[in-house]
Amino acid sequence: GVASSDATNMQATAVLDGDEYVINGEKWWTSGAGDPRCKILVFMAVTNPEAAKHQRHSMMLVPMESEGIEIQKMMHVFGYDDAPHGHAHIKFNNVRIPKDNLLLGEGRGFEIAQGRLGPGRIHHCMRTIGVGERAIELMCKRGIDPSKTPFGKNIASLGANFDYIA
């Protein structure tokens, strides 16, 4: 496999054979694949290895029940499995899909991925900032809670707690 987050460095292939693409390769961190409601995968593969670096890949829809799809294992992130949604390591062995399952056209996979990843990254950053702000809010609230007064003082005034909040 390829140990990289460089989307242009993938090895999974989709080769046109008549009216079908034949998919071979592996995908790690396939989000949502563990969820029993997941019926279709959005799959990016090399369709033209001779094309320019950012035009080699195509995006296609792959039904989960397709013959040749094998979930190898579910992945953990910092010990958390995100069940049942999860992230999977999947092998694709001669998986055949109709050529009509191609999205936007051959060579446009990288373009599609970048169009989705940019806004997705902003979304995750905003969510994380929001969670951080909420944690600080709860910490401050607890620090001055009149019902929490060990040694007769509020928690914020004890030890380094005020510094931690700052």
Where are these regions (language model features)?
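Glycine-rich phosphate/pyrophosphate-binding beta-alpha loops
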Residues: 1-5, 28-35, 119-123
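Short glycine/proline-enriched turns and hinge-like loops at secondary-structure junctions
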Residues: 5-8, 33-38, 52-56, 82-84, ...
